[in-house]
Regions:
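Short Pro-Gly-centered beta-turn/loop motif in secreted/extracellular proteins
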Residues: 78-87, 311-317, 703-729, 741, ...
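Short, ordered, surface-exposed loop/turn motifs in non-cytosolic proteins
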Residues: 49-58, 62-73, 684-693, 765-780
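Post-signal-peptide, soluble extracytosolic/periplasmic N-terminal scaffold domains
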Residues: 2-12, 16-271, 581, 586-661
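Sequence/structural signature of outer-membrane beta-barrel proteins
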Residues: 171-179, 208-214, 242-248, 357-363, ...
Length: 836
């Protein structure tokens, strides 16, 4: 009986591996002529061929490493041959083994870089799982160091490669107004985010340029800093311009040095709350978001409700000031409260921050006063947390003490009090005090998230550090407004989200109220959003209200309500196309209705949308507006454009965005880099999709970038094997990486580039090559291929001509080959080789 597929050997190996509880005997005579010279003893005893295998190293079922491991043929205590891995003492230590408790590990290893004797650990076992390419290490728990759950072992943390990287984004818009006085407005916005990685050090900068109308362009640097992780301290060291943490005091922009705990290095069951900016645009509008005086986000949105989730906020508090620049020249301004949740730490956990430097205001005319800050939080018994801090600066001192606690299923609560001593420019010394209560609860069972913060200002002289330092200016001008002179008496912010499942939808509520001292009235801001899925479509209702106190004691109040519905048209179009309708109704009139069709094409690389809207109270002929939007997600970046037209105005806009990484292999262009980045390397495999992201493909060298990796956790980077070129094969389609904060880590795929061939081998005397013989392509890295029962071997990555080495037992021979002129079926060469 003849076997046509070289996969037979792998099948036998799999049977042997899976049947380790039973004894199987393989009869060599069943292989026919191919049995000559075949030693089946290793197969009969369930053992693979010795050699080097690339495997995932698993300790008690958890991956701790991926590497090439040398396996040697040894005998166990019963004299049975086994494959034993060569692992060094230093490797075992990195895998979490308490090597210092087992001196016998060093019996065979004179240095930490030689093979250790794993039998020195009682009941420890090492098994090669050839089917899954895993080395399974079974280590008793008493021989392992305690480990944190939720993050990868520290031995796997990868600081990445030296690299220069930069994000870029730009947008330009031209608006022509046709009614009354004809005029043209041009606005442009550019943001650059360059960075350098050297070892654990990260150097980062964010610089933006903005021009609007007739005003000249203005550059603004949001920050420039260098930082690195101090892993033994579970902390980060920052030098330069950044913003202080906002868990105890309000966030403060500074230039100086900061040493602070890094929560990402220590797993929490819950991560820090991330804000979402929700609003409603009456027209196609530009939305600008500022935090602590700096522009952190700038984009264009379609008419109707919007939700901005990609905000690069500081990891701290600070309200988000949102401005919506409508196409008709009007503006909306509102504030999204953003505060950190209540403080509640696990018992024994210490969290700290130390800061010294100069105050860095967004206004360049503000004096750069010296500042210092220290904060400390510590988890006490009985689910309590004590915390406190001090702030000191020219003309300002503050101290804060607080106590927080975990209430179990009822959430977390913290209360603190602060005392300040300050003097604004040109004013007398003031003393003040405030109390703050924070409550947060996240109920996974009911899908509820709730955050509440209440400030009570006990006296009129209370000021924050920014209030005081912003009053000192070196240009001689004192900026004053009647609102700056108002003293708040209390402030409350609320954030609530509730999920009711697929059919009832999701509800979110945000709100804030500020009461003023010695003046009646208050400022209010509320937002309500509800959305659900209906028959494959989506329905959402949004409402926003902003109520602002004016100088004369009156209030300016504006409500906006929006209803939106979307329905897929798949059953008619056969692809990803949807139709939508939305109605936007401001309280001061100007109700707008809009219908649109949007979809995707070219494997989701092209996004397109066509809209038609009507505004009821617009001037004659100006109520109808037509709009077109296109966006291309390319391998080398993002490109978008939009066009809208009505009898009153015409607007055109173009935007681009992308990321650049310069590394030891050259320059790689890709889509914008977010967070830690994987540099995918699949040499010779160009145009292969990576990670399932639209448009993310390898370039002409086989390189690309994938961002948004989870830091200090295992991430899987995948190639789409169905899109590989005909002359390319990969030995694995998944690579796992564990990046540190801001790292550029290599995700290397082992590729074989060249021809594929099925070669029949013969010896000089005409006899067949034995079954199971190893065939190595000389000059090619990677594992050997195996000869099947027909003396055939499947080879990949072949050059036009070359040499093969064939080994079996103690014998070997060589084959010189030259590819035929024509390929066979499935682009596979059929050829013969004489082994000498």
């Amino acid at each position: 009986m003849k076997f046509k597929h070289p996969a037979l050997l792998l099948f036998i190996a799999g049977v042997v591996h899976c049947a380790n509880a039973h004894a199987y005997t393989f009869d060599a005579s069943m292989l026919g002529d191919a049995a000559k010279g075949v030693d089946m003893s290793l197969f009969n005893q369930g053992v693979q061929q010795p050699g080097t295998y690339r495997v995932d190293v698993m300790v008690n079922g958890k991956r701790v490493d991926t590497r090439d491991v040398v396996f040697k043929l040894e005998k166990d205590g019963q004299g049975t041959p086994v494959l034993a891995p060569c692992l060094t003492v230093s490797q075992l230590s990195r895998y979490g083994v308490k090597t210092e408790d087992y001196p016998q590990l060093w019996k065979a290893a004179k240095t930490p870089d030689e093979c250790a004797d794993l039998t020195a650990i009682p009941q420890a076992k090492a098994v090669l799982d050839i089917n899954n390419q895993q080395l399974q290490l079974s280590i008793p728990q008493v021989a392992l160091r305690p480990e944190f759950k939720g993050i990868a072992p520290e031995a796997l943390w990868d600081d990445g490669i030296p690299a220069f990287l930069m994000n870029y984004s730009a947008r330009t818009t031209q608006t022509d107004y046709k009614m009354d006085m004809e005029r043209r407005d041009n606005s442009s916005w550019v943001q650059l985010q360059p960075g350098i990685n050297i070892g654990a050090w990260r150097v980062r900068n964010a610089t933006s340029w903005q021009r609007s109308g007739q005003l000249s362009g203005k550059w603004q640097a949001a920050y420039t800093y260098a930082e690195r992780g101090l892993y033994s301290l579970k902390s980060r060291l920052t030098l330069g311009q950044k913003t202080s943490q906002g868990e105890i005091f309000d966030s403060v922009p500074f230039t100086g040095v900061m040493l602070a705990s890094d929560d990402n290095m220590v797993p929490y069951s819950e991560r820090q709350f991330a804000p979402v900016v929700r609003g409603i645009a009456r027209t196609q509008a530009r939305v600008e978001v500022k935090q602590n005086g700096y522009t952190i986000y700038n984009t264009t949105v379609a008419p109707g409700p919007f939700a901005l989730r990609e905000l690069s906020v500081t990891d701290s508090s600070g309200d988000l000031h949102v401005t919506v620049w409508e196409a008709d020249g009007s503006t909306q301004m509102f504030v999204v409260p953003y505060q950190t949740p209540a403080i509640a730490l696990h018992q024994g956990y210490l969290k700290y921050s130390l800061l010294a430097g100069r105050y860095r205001s967004s206004d360049s005319a503000t004096d750069k006063a010296q500042i210092a800050q220290a904060t400390l939080m510590y988890g006490l018994p009985w689910n309590l947390t004590a915390y406190g801090g001090i702030q000191s600066a020219t003309h300002y001192q503050a101290a804060l003490l607080g106590l927080g606690g975990s209430l179990g299923r009822w959430g977390s609560l913290s209360v603190d009090g602060s005392d300040t001593h300050s003097q604004r420019q040109g004013e007398a010394v003031q003393q003040g005090a405030s109390w703050r209560l924070r409550y947060s609860n996240q109920l996974a069972a009911t899908g509820t998230n709730f955050f509440l913060t209440r400030w009570q200002y006990a006296s009129q002289g209370y000021n924050t550090l920014s209030d005081v330092l912003d009053s000192y200016r070196h240009d001689g001008n004192r900026l004053w407004s009647w609102r700056e002179n108002l003293q708040p008496s209390s402030r409350t912010t609320l954030m609530l989200s509730q999920s009711w499942g697929r059919h009832l939808g999701n509800l979110s509520l945000t709100g804030s109220r500020t009461d003023w001292r010695n003046r009646p009235g208050h400022d209010d801001s509320y937002g309500l959003s509800w959305g659900t899925s209906i028959g494959g479509g989506s329905l959402s209702l949004n409402w926003n209200q902003n109520r602002t106190l004016w100088r004369n004691g009156a209030h300016r109040k504006e409500n906006i309500t929006s209803l939106w519905f979307s329905m897929p048209l798949r059953c008619w179009t056969g692809n990803n196309v949807s139709a939508s309708w939305q109605m936007t109704s401001p309280s001061h009139g100007g109700q707008t209705q809009q219908v649109g069709v949007n979809g995707e094409a070219f494997s989701q690389q092209l996004d397109w949308e066509v809209r038609q809207s009507y505004r009821a109270d617009a001037p004659p002929g100006g109520g109808n507006n037509s709009a077109l939007h296109l966006a291309w997600n390319g391998a080398y970046g993002l490109l978008g454009g939009d066009y809208s037209y009505s009898r009153a105005m015409r607007q055109m806009g173009v935007n681009i965005a992308g990321g650049i990484v310069i590394h030891h292999h050259g320059v790689t262009l890709g889509q914008p880099l977010q967070g830690s980045v994987a540099l995918v390397e699949a040499p010779g495999a160009s145009g292969v999709p990576v990670g399932g992201w639209p448009g993310v493909k390898t370039d002409f060298r086989g390189d690309t970038t994938v961002g948004n990796l989870s830091v200090y956790q295992e991430n899987t980077v995948s190639l789409d094997p169905s899109q590989l070129p005909d002359d390319a094969e990969v030995t694995q389609t998944d690579v796992r990486v564990v990046p540190t904060e801001g790292a550029v880590v290599e995700a290397k795929f082992h590729t074989r580039i060249g021809a594929r061939a099925l070669m029949t081998l013969k010896r000089e005397d005409g006899s067949a090559i034995p079954f199971g013989a190893q065939v190595i392509v000389n000059g090619q890295d990677g594992s050997a291929d195996l000869v099947d029962t027909d003396s055939q071997v499947y080879l990949t990555g072949l050059a036009d001509k070359g040499e093969l080495t064939v080994k079996w037992g103690a014998q070997q021979c060589r084959v010189n080959y030259h590819l035929p002129a024509h390929k066979g079926i499935a682009s596979l060469y059929q050829m013969s080789g004489l082994c000498r």
